[in-house]
Swiss-Prot record:
SUPFAM superfamilies: Immunoglobulin. It is a single-pass type I membrane protein. A motif (ITIM motif 2) lies at residues 446-451. A motif (ITIM motif 4) lies at residues 528-533. This is Neutrophil immunoglobulin-like receptor 1.
Length: 547
């Protein structure tokens, strides 16, 4: 019994080692796809799983779903490969694929992953691809491919027609325009960069689902071979409607020539014609010219067996006469949707800015009108206040004559300004009368008088707005007789003295008039002081009182 158990154990170990060795020697299959790993929706795809001779069963599965493989059995003739068809590609077909096979009941390892990308999933916004400085680049220099879209994709990817060149970049969104872009810098340029390029957009969470492609952009590399010549027989300055033909020729036997307009995208290529003199040439007929035909042109030569073009010809400028077009925008009906959207957005932005500016302007005008009206009302109120002062009331008088407002222009021409300021003094017995000449800039030659009594507590000044000379003379005569001024000064019940200043001329004369004696022959406590300017009133102050 013990011997039987040992024999069975040895047999099992031997079979296990043999199976392990057999599995290790089964090579990995190779998985391929046609027409390409990047396909558009609704297209047909064929997967090929290949291995060495003798496989009996092949299986294909998508990563993430290994339990539901698609398997094909090869009988009665085992072969090297098997085909798996997908008649119509849908977005859910995108992903990573593997295949494996079986020989004598043993399974091989999985093939390397094959990524299938489905394009055309997002078609709501078209992408645009452009190149700087031009689609024809001199060998050894750099160029920049610019991919832009209104959709906020996470990444843009740039591909060549054979998908041998693939590069992806994160998008950069421009807030004012709402566009996203990516700049692909390429260089130094070689002949391997010649070809047709496209760009796509996709999101990070679905990297195998791409947008519709941009329009194809052809890139050509110009080399160091001899440049051709570009000529025109119609001249450089043309009228609209003239039929224009450009001729490109060279003494090198180029197989074809290409014509490129600087700043454009399209490149015209024609087969060259050999002349008896050994020149190669071709004609590019541009048809009847219009304003968009004007610009700068260059031509290149190329051989059929080389993807590299010659050096650029000297530039040829074509000018079109006629009136200058004020607007270069195409009609709205002929704009593509993306350009129409940009145009509408720009128009809305300009309109909003204009309305905001108009609102601010109206606000400023209304505010200034309100301030002017408020100032005018204040001036009228001030005039009314000045006119409402009763006789004998104190009216504040400004020293600045230029700022005084008069209610009656006729009276203003008859009166002369009088300025009097009365200040308290520290001493109780002193009386001062200060006079000074008017400023040189005063056109009316006004005279100022400042009277400073010692015990003044309150000042009452009566200054008429317009006073005739007869009235002034009467006032002075009364002042000489001591009937009015002295009576008011002696009979005042309040503890204050009243001082009067009368100015009626440009010459200041100062006098002290003694008040009349009382019945007992006693003088009052303090005399009154008079100051007068009187050229027209010489008798206002008695001569015996002058100093």
């Amino acid at each position: 019994m013990t011997f039987t158990c040992k024999a069975l154990l040895c047999l099992g170990m031997t079979l296990g080692l043999w199976i392990t060795v057999l599995t290790e020697f089964l090579p990995r299959p190779i998985l391929r796809v046609q027409p390409d790993t990047v396909v558009s929706t609704q297209s047909k795809v064929i997967f090929f799983c290949e291995r060495s001779q003798g496989a009996e069963l092949y299986c294909l599965y998508k990563k993430g779903n290994p339990r539901n493989p698609r398997c094909k059995e090869i009988r009665p003739k085992p072969g090297k490969k098997v085909e798996f068809f997908i008649s119509k590609i849908e977005p859910y077909h995108a992903g990573h694929y593997h295949c494996y096979y079986q020989i004598h009941g043993q399974w091989s390892e999985d093939s390397d992953a094959l990524e299938l990308v489905v394009t055309g999933v997002y078609d709501y916004n078209e992408l645009r691809l452009s190149v700087l400085p031009s689609p024809v680049v001199t060998v050894g220099r750099n160029m920049t491919l610019h991919c832009i879209s209104h959709s906020h994709y996470d990444k843009f990817i740039l591909t060549k027609e054979d998908h041998k060149f693939t590069s992806s970049l994160d998008t950069q969104c421009i807030p004012p325009s709402g566009q996203c872009q990516a700049l692909f810098v390429m260089g130094p340029m070689t002949s391997n960069h010649t070809g047709t390029f496209r760009c796509y957009g996709y999101y990070k969470h679905t990297p195998q689902l791409w947008s519709i492609p941009s329009e194809p952009l052809e890139i050509h590399i110009s080399g160091l071979s001899k440049k051709p010549s570009l000529l025109t027989h119609q001249g450089h300055i043309l009228d609209p409607g003239v039929n224009l033909t450009l001729q490109c020729c060279s003494d090198i036997n180029y197989d074809r020539f290409a014509l490129y307009k600087v700043g454009g995208v399209d490149i015209m290529q024609h087969t060259s014609q050999q002349t008896d003199t050994g020149f190669s040439m071709t004609n590019f007929t541009l048809g009847y010219v219009h304003h968009s035909t004007g610009g700068q042109y260059r031509c290149y030569g190329a051989h059929n067996l080389s993807s590299e073009w010659s050096a650029s010809s000297d530039p040829l400028d074509i000018l079109i006469t006629g009136p200058i077009q004020m607007s270069t925008l195409p009609p709205i009906t002929s704009m593509p949707p993306d350009q129409l959207e940009s145009y509408v957005n720009a128009l809305i932005g300009v309109s909003v800015a204009f309305l905001v500016f108009l609102f601010i302007l109206i606000f400023i005008i209304l505010q200034r009108r309100h301030q002017r009206k408020f100032r005018k009302d204040g001036e009228e109120a001030q005039k009314e206040k000045e006119l409402q002062y009763p006789t004998g009331a104190v009216e504040p008088i400004s020293r600045d004559r230029d700022q005084q407002k008069r209610s009656n222009a006729a009276a203003a021409t008859q009166e002369e300004s009088v300025y009097a300021s009365v200040e308290d003094m520290e001493t109780e017995d002193g009386v001062e009368l200060d006079t000074w000449k008017p400023p040189e800039g005063d056109p009316q030659g006004e005279t100022y008088a400042q009277v400073k009594p010692s015990r003044l507590r309150r000042v009452e000044a009566i200054i008429p707005s317009a006073m005739s000379r007869e009235q002034l003379n009467t006032k002075y005569e009364q002042a000489e007789e001591g009937q009015e001024v002295d009576g008011q000064a002696t009979e005042s019940e309040e503890p204050q003295d009243v001082t009067y200043a009368q100015l009626c001329s440009r010459t200041l004369r100062q006098g002290t008039a003694a008040p009349p004696l009382s019945q007992a022959g006693e003088a009052p406590e303090e005399p009154s002081v008079y100051a007068a300017l009187a050229t027209a009133c010489p008798g206002a102050v008695p001569k015996d009182k002058e100093q």
